[in-house]
UniProtKB/Swiss-Prot annotation:
NCBIfam families xref list: manA (TIGR00218)
Catalytic residues identified in the record: 193
Keywords noted in UniProt: Carbohydrate metabolism, Isomerase, Metal-binding, Zinc
Gene from which the chain derives: yvyI
Protein name: Putative mannose-6-phosphate isomerase YvyI
Length: 316
């Protein structure tokens, strides 16, 4: 049983739309000049992160979940529930839909559904996202996709650093070029591409689309994901609540000074996206820097964070 923060070593994924921002911004060693994703806190079979410190050093997060459920407050479930990513969107990502739990369970061999959310760490001027569509029925959705009426179909939204978007399963969506994003999502890789700008993969073939599944899984008409943001300030910290939903709750902690904290959840997932500081508990001190990702376990004692830094924090 551990009462210490559990730091994770990320896994990186090359993507046709990726770049070098994960290296340039966070100092990571990335596999190529087209690195799109950092699976920062992951217990997904396609890319589990590894414990970097303490008594469980060297174990994957999958192994830790399976062998030491007490670390996570005894939370039930076959699969660790969440996945935290950093996304370097140098070029447009594909337009896609993710299924809900029921559809994924029926069609994706045990995958969870995929509700997700985005925190915009940084973006270029006039950057945007695709969030939803204008179709009023599935018949109209099919017609507009088949005719390539993307301008008429897609809802485009301008974004800026600090924005937050909740993306429920069934939402037609895409991140567009020029964005650096922290994504919190259900622990799933179920994705149905609708359109990919006719790009070719590394073998020179068009990337696979999943038209029928995407239409089946899509929410029609579009419904915006509901968020109810609030802000609380006290000595040393400002906490912004972005969403408290069925699958996860997500917050931003802005530390400026020294903040006293308590860990009251089954576990907390933490990512340092800016600045540096010290996490102190009992007689121990852990340095924190931009690009660190860690879990605060169920048995974590009260602690303080001292410094100037920003964290995105989530729990189930």
């Amino acid at each position: 049983m551990t009462q210490s923060p559990i730091f994770l070593t990320p896994v990186f994924k090359e993507k046709i739309w990726g770049g070098t921002a994960l290296r340039d911004r966070f100092g990571y060693s990335i596999p190529s000049e087209s690195t799109g994703e950092c699976w920062a806190i992951s217990a997904h079979p396609k890319g589990p992160s590894t414990v970097a410190n303490g008594p469980y050093k060297g174990k994957t997060l999958i192994e830790l979940w399976e062998e030491h459920r007490e670390v996570f407050g005894g939370v039930e479930g076959d699969r660790f529930p969440l996945l935290t990513k950093l996304l370097d969107v140098k070029e447009d990502t594909s337009i896609k839909v993710h299924p809900d739990d029921y559809y994924a369970g029926e069609n994706e061999e045990g995958e969870l559904g995929k509700t997700e959310c985005w925190y915009i760490i940084d973006c270029k001027e006039n950057a945007e996202i695709i969030y939803g569509h204008t179709a009023r029925s599935k018949t109209e959705l099919v017609t507009m996709i088949n005719s390539g009426d993307w301008e008429g179909l897609l809802r485009r939204i301008k974004i800026k650093p600090g924005d937050f978007y909740y993306v429920p399963s069934g939402t037609l969506h895409a991140l567009c070029k020029g964005a650096l994003v922290l994504e919190t999502q259900q622990n799933s890789d179920a994705t149905y591409r609708v359109y990919d700008y006719d790009r070719l993969d590394s073998n020179g073939s068009p990337r696979e689309l999943h038209f029928a599944k995407a239409v089946n899984a899509a929410t029609v008409p579009h419904v915006d994901g509901y968020i109810d943001e609030s802000t609380e300030s006290r000595k040393g910290i400002t906490i912004k609540t972005f969403v408290q939903g069925e699958y996860f709750s997500v917050y931003k902690w802005d530390i400026n000074g020294e903040a006293e904290m308590a860990q009251d959840e089954s576990f907390l997932i933490c990512s340092v996206i800016e600045g540096s500081g010290l996490l102190k508990y009992e007689d121990k001190t852990c340095p924190l820097k931009k690009g660190d990702h860690f879990i605060l376990p169920a048995q974590m004692p009260d602690f303080t964070i001292k410094g100037t830094c920003t964290l995105i924090v989530s729990h189930i």
